[in-house]
Regions:
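Juxtamembrane interfacial secondary-structure elements that flank transmembrane helices
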Residues: 23-35, 87-91, 100, 125-131, ...
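Hydrophobic transmembrane alpha-helices
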Residues: 2-23, 60-71, 114, 136-248
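Short, solvent-exposed loop/turn segments at secondary-structure junctions
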Residues: 57, 100, 122, 159, ...
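Juxtamembrane "helix exit" motif at the C-terminal ends of alpha-helical transmembrane segments
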Residues: 62-66, 117-130
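Active-site pocket-lining segments that scaffold enzyme catalytic pockets across diverse folds
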Residues: 93, 106-125
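Membrane-helix and juxtamembrane interface regions of eukaryotic multi-pass membrane proteins
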Residues: 1-87, 92-109
Length: 248
């Protein structure tokens, strides 16, 4: 991918993120708590998550392996951090899910397209288009790297713990919804989304990559409206007093 193509992709993805942000305040993505048959054909939720998330893991792996900097310390570490998240998201998280919920095929396919494009954005910059000499070993001793990596792992910890809290709300066979109360859910209604946003802000800080900042924009554009919808749903089901002053 050339520099001009890369810059066009960043601009296009940024513009699309703004459109998605607005649209999701009017249209609830029909997966998880908002699953509805109106979205048409659906697939097993576990299979859907694997097929949706695995492409970005594989695209990043391909771009890294074919680059000349693949074993340089900084790019290699960036690669490991990115793949750590997506290995868990693609090949562990889906199989920890409980229940027999479904994922609309349309949402899965849109997720595949986004993840392929995001993998291209991240990998092209980190392994091919970053200015020569930028990501030397000295990068790993910069304040931005250390601040970013701390944020990254704090966010990952919040995300993983919040997912665990959600999974353990129900006993086997129970299909009711419950208001999560532990961990970050004491402060926000979507602790898992908050953790993921912090995680990718950390990645953007530690890499100073323009592609990573576009991904932060996308993460916010996708998750903030959904967090708002979930908060409203909790208020409807459990009452405003139960939800309290938790942020979205």
């Amino acid at each position: 991918m050339g520099q001009q193509t890369f810059e066009f992709l960043l601009l296009a993805m940024s513009a699309l993120a703004v459109i998605v942000f607005v649209a999701l305040y009017y249209v609830r993505a029909g997966y998880g708590i908002f699953h509805t048959p109106k979205w048409g054909l659906s697939v097993n939720n576990k299979l859907g998550w694997v097929l949706m998330e695995a492409p970005v893991f594989l695209v990043m792996l391909y771009l890294w392996w074919n680059s000349s900097v693949r074993f340089d310390a900084a790019p290699f570490l960036f690669f490991l951090l990115f793949e750590l998240h997506y290995f868990q998201r693609s090949f562990i998280f889906p199989f920890l899910m409980k229940g027999k919920s479904r994922m609309p095929l349309a949402i899965m396919l849109m997720g595949v397209v986004f993840n392929v494009l995001n993998g291209l954005m991240q990998g092209e910059w980190l392994f091919y288009l970053a200015p020569e000499g930028l990501y030397t070993d000295a990068w790993l001793s910069t304040p931005s790297f250390w601040f970013g990596i701390i944020l990254f792992f704090i966010g990952m910890g919040i995300n993983l713990h919040s997912d665990s809290v959600i999974r353990h709300l129900r006993k086997p066979g129970d299909t009711r919804h419950y208001l999560p109360q532990k961990g970050m859910y004491r402060y926000v209604t979507s602790g898992n989304y908050f953790g993921e946003l912090v995680e990718w802000i950390g990645f953007a800080v530690l890499t100073c990559s323009p592609a990573a900042w576009v991904f932060v924009l996308w993460t916010f554009a996708n998750l903030a409206p959904r967090a708002n919808s979930i908060r409203n749903r909790y208020r409807e089901e459990f009452g405003k007093d139960a939800v309290g002053k938790r942020k979205e």
